[in-house]
Amino acid sequence: MCTAAVYKTKDFYFGRNLDYEFPYGEEVTITPRNYPFSFRFQGEMKKHYAMIGMAHVADDYPLYYDAINEKGLGMAGLNFVGNAVYGEPVLGKEERTAGEKKTGMAEGHEIEAEIDNVAQFELPLWLLGQCASVKEARVLLSRINITNTPFNEKYPVSQLHWMIADRKETIVVEAVADGLHVYDNPVGVLANNPPFPQQMFRLNDYRSLSPRQPENSFVPGLELTAYSRGMGAMGLPGDLSSASRFVRAAFVRGNSISGDSEAESVSQFFHILHSVEQQRGCC
């Protein structure tokens, strides 16, 4: 059960809560620039951007939960159980122009045009290795086929959706039964289920909430007092379900303010993430 968020002052911050009851061996992992990777369908990527994030390293391969590259493009995968649907590899080149290639975003790396088969676990490396921005990631996503190829027998395919962001824009990527969808994300947060459009629609239920104190409109002539700070946000969900965490994170992140210094910004960003953290045993 996870929640991801972005935050921007004079700098850009990308982070997430990874709330599990037990660890999966994840650790801070740095992938140096141009460290060679072999993809199941795309061959070897010899040139790519450096990145840092949380990963479980298996067979010298970083299985990233989340990461950000040297250009400031961040990406996080969150559980999307019951909704994520990946495709079989699209083999053959019958529909491609013979010899047609397109150059990837990282200098010197070429990828074939039209359809790129990329295993689900390879997606962070595929995008963060080549793309300097969300705009560039959209280009690769427009021709990608995320496949249901497992890393190995020990690590089966994970059901995920992803938030991808730079300092200018944020998107959500969901592979579901009717295909791959890329959504603009104006609230800069993501949780788990339900699918992103439903999460966004549910925000309509909370349109009256505010960080300001509420006006008394209960009954004409009846004097009522706002006896505590924060009463403008009464009704903001506080349970640990993913739908409620999405609403709470969107509200807190969207109304948070801090100074522009690094210390102030980092502190406030951790406060945002702490607002939706989960305590062991509570769910």
Model-derived regions, located:
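Aromatic/basic-lined ligand-recognition segments
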Residues: 170-179, 184-186
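Aromatic- and glycine-enriched pocket-lining scaffold segments that form the walls
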Residues: 134, 138-174
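Short, glycine/acidic-rich beta->alpha junctions
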Residues: 60, 119-120, 156
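Alpha/propeptide regions of enzymes that mature by internal proteolysis
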Residues: 77, 93-102, 106-147, 240-279
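Histidine- and/or cysteine-centered catalytic micro-motif in compact active-site loops
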Residues: 80, 176-178, 252-254
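C-terminus-biased signal that marks the final domain/tail of proteins
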Residues: 1-13, 27, 49, 149-151, ...
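A contiguous strand-loop segment
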Residues: 1-115, 148
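Short, flexible loop/turn elements at secondary-structure junctions
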Residues: 18, 79, 166-168, 177
